[in-house]
Design a protein with these regions (language model features):
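A glycine-rich beta-to-alpha transition motif near the start of alpha/beta enzyme domains, typified by
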Residues: 1-146
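Residue-level detector of conserved catalytic or cofactor/ligand-binding positions
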Residues: 147-157
Length: 157
């Protein structure tokens, strides 16, 4: 039987939360911005999301970030998150999984003892700092995008 699509995935975890990072999905995710890429995934790739996350390949607790080209030239890569309930613009644990996988597979330029990256997400640009030793990510921290939920809620009251 011929393979119709080859997918490169790395299974990692962030504090025990599993992530299957797709570093070579072969997907052509269209969009001029990360928000457009997210919308494209929602409209065209839900069957693919189910293929990766549901049995027999996946399981209920699994999430899967997709590494895509960044739309902002200042960023090192882009990320879209597939969760059981759909596609999400950003997830901290999935970001940690993605950065760990990319560092440990040599998919991004690594500087020891600290690697700094900029990640393009549909929620905005996220800055990441990874402590690296012997090619392994020892810790990953990030400065997330601003929260808008509280301000929006206050304005409604």
């Amino acid at each position: 039987m011929k393979n119709r699509q080859l997918i490169q995935a790395v299974d990692v975890h962030a504090a025990g939360e599993p992530g299957r990072v797709l570093i070579g999905s072969g997907l052509r995710v269209k969009g001029a911005t990360m928000a457009e890429k997210l919308r494209y995934c929602e409209e065209h790739l839900d069957d693919f999301r189910n293929l990766i996350l549901h049995e027999p390949r996946g399981y209920p607790g699994l999430c899967s970030p997709i590494v895509v080209p960044a739309t902002d030239p200042s960023c090192d890569f882009g990320m879209i998150v597939m969760e059981q309930g759909g596609f999400k613009p950003m997830s901290g644990s999935n970001l940690i999984c993605t950065v760990t996988a990319l560092i440990e597979t040599g998919s991004v330029d690594v500087s020891e003892p600290v690697t700094e990256l900029r990640v393009d997400t549909a929620a905005g640009i996220v800055t990441v700092r990874a402590e690296v030793e012997a090619g392994r990510a020892k810790s990953v921290t990030f400065g997330n995008v601003p929260e808008i939920g509280r301000a929006s809620c206050r304005e409604r009251v």
